[in-house]
Structure formats: C-alpha cells, structure tokens
Amino acid sequence: IYSFDGILISLHGHSPHWQKNIIKIKDEERGEVVTWKNGDKTLFLNDDLPRHFPIKESSPPNISNFSPESIPEEINFIPVSQGLEFFFDLEHKYDIFDLIKKGAGDKYSIHGEVTSPFDYLLNLFGIERAMVYLVQEPSKSKEILQRYTGGVKKIALEQTQHNIDAIKISSPYAGAGFISPAFYKEFVLPYEAQIARVVRDRGVHVYTHTCGAIDDRLEMMVEAGISGIECLDPPPLGDVLLDDAKKRIGDRIFIKGNIDPVNVLLLGTEEIVRKDAEFRIEVGKPGGGFILSTACSIAPHTKRENVQVLRRVAENIN
C-alpha cells in the first residue's frame, strides 16, 4: 500500500497463546475494551496507543529503600506506554524476527528495537518522581540506570543474532522537553553509548529515536557512537532545521526524518506533502546519509494518499 522499504520490530516475545488470557472483548465508541483473566482491562483506542487499567493499582517504590540489585540481570519486559508493560514469553522471545525475515527475505531493511535505560528508570518510579530523583539521588539513579543497561545490552545482543540490519534505541524522554543537555550527558549518554558499542561491535547499525526538541544535543547524541538519529522534529513540534543539522552532524551519522507528521502529513494536502518531501530531499541528499521519513509516528487519521506521496517523490528524484 505505502511501498515502505523497511520493517521495524518494536515489540517481540509475543506468546502464541495470548488470546487464551482474554475473558471478554467489548466494543465501545472509542475502541475495544479487553478484560484479561487477572482482572486487568486494556482499552485499545481507535486512534491512539492502548491504555491499561490494572485491577489493582501498585505504588512505585521509593528510591531511598530501593535496591538496584533487585533489578534482574535479564529484563523480561518492555515499558510500552502509559504504565503498560509488555512481558516476553521467554520461550518465544524472538520468534517474530524469524517470521518476518522468512516472509520479507532481503527485500526490506529489518530493524530491531530496544528501550533506553532512561525509560526503564522513568517506568520504575513514574516520570515525575524519577525526574526528582535525578536531582535528589543522582548516584543511586546511576546505579539503577547501569543495572538496566546490562539487561538492555543483553536484549540488543540477542537481537543481532536474528539477521537484522539495524537496532533502534527508543529514547523518547531524552529531549529538551524533559531534561537539560547537562542531564542528558549525565543520565542518558553514558548508558546508551554502552548499548551502541556492543551492537556496533557485532557489525550491526544502531540509531537513536528521540522525539521533540533535540537541537541543543545533536552533537552529544553522536558521541554515543551511534550510526544515526531518527526524528529530528522540525518546528513547531521540535526545533531541528535540517540544513543546520546536516552541516553539524551529517558527515558523521545518517539522519532520518524531519517531515512534520502533524502539520504536513496529517493536516496538509497532497501538494503540501509533495513540496515538503522535495525540500527535505534537496537539503538532505547532498553527500548522502539522509533517509526520507516522517519525524515521528504517522498519526492514525493521516490520509493514505498523503503517505503514498513520499514514495513517489523519492522515486521521481531518484
């Protein structure tokens, strides 16, 4: 339909028997509500990420009496969003990689994904409390980050054994909307750099996905030893100007993104999308290292025709 040339495996470890855990599915105007055997409910929205409602709310731990050693060496879940944790079926941890490779062959670029240790920290304590702990308990926060880093590295290394072309480090909370450049350098960079290093040592490319405003930390992101950066949201969603980013870091890593997924792709006409895509290619193409893409995810209500324009523009410009 869209002629994309890559497949991102953002979740893995699906149980082949997951449907057996469902008690009831109820259709609502906003989407489907699934009730699970343990009593939890998940609202699968028509136009947004799922929202999970556990039957019993659990309070996050307090860092003062939390032991970093209590974090298992082998991480068994992905902190997806809004408190939802996706747990692996350890007997089928990477089945999806092999299934996709079998179906796609060498026709598509296949990417795995791991989550930044910083996200695991935020998931553990809750975003607001975790941010406070960075100020109040920086040393212990780093111990926890290092513990999670070990587990994420293990997942990344396991993914490299499944014929993938690259691994994405999902790090959506590491932009200027959440932390300063100084905090990025202290609490994000050292840990993502460790992940990048072990992946690159396996001969697999690795790139970082950070949403929003990242103009003030582009060079620091490159210091992690990554192969590329994804998103580079332009104003007003972010603050990255493609020509400036290209001059500053384009000779060291690849750049993927910079098309506004809201104001251009969702709200724009086909002509607006065409002109914007042509501009991004004109700026990004010289010297290579630019991948035409939306800055972040495509909004659910985006017209199919607008997305299809991107492929036509890429083919016409060659």
Placement of each model-derived feature along the sequence:
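Catalytic domains of carbohydrate-active enzymes, especially glycoside hydrolases
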Residues: I1-S10, E158-D165
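Active-site loop segments of alpha/beta catalytic cores
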Residues: I55-N318
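A contiguous, low-structure linker/loop signature
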Residues: G13-S81, D106-K107
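Generic hydrophobic, aliphatic-rich segments that mediate packing or membrane embedding
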Residues: S3, E28, K93-I96
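A structural signal for short, well-ordered beta-strand segments and their strand-loop junctions
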Residues: G6-L11, S109-E113
